[in-house]
Amino acid sequence: MKPSLICGCPKFDESVPVERLNGRKISNNYASFVTLTDGYIKDAMCGYRIYPVEPFYKICRFSYIDSHMGFDTEILIRMIWKNVPIIYMPVEVSYPVGGKSNFRMIRDNIRISFMFARMTIGMWLRYPILNKRRKSQKSEKDKNKTDE
């Protein structure tokens, strides 16, 4: 069995700030774009994860990885590029009234934007492989639909 990334999939209650939901949607869409995986990424920013040791070690050893708010998203993208399977687990999330966030609006958005710029370049360098994988997965899904 191939090692998998266990990734939290947040189930937000009504306390979640709208700007956080919108930011997550943008990140999820962009992460899906740079991995060519339409709808596969449930939540790119959730830090509730269990990483498979060998792929994680190789990624960290041979790649520059953002060390702040972009870390979780970048690792997820790189794991998908390496074709590491992802298992999503639901995680209940609520935001306490008056809770403190470690997110710094300007600084962290700039860092995340630069991370996505690097990931876009990485996607284009890997495009032939990612596109072939995407087409293969799409044809497999189509085949499964016709078998039903």
Q: What would you call each of these model-derived segments?
A:
Residues 1-69, 96-103, 107-113:
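Acceptor/aglycone-binding surface of glycosyltransferases and processive sugar-polymer synthases
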Residues 38, 62-148:
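Hydrophobic helical membrane-anchoring modules
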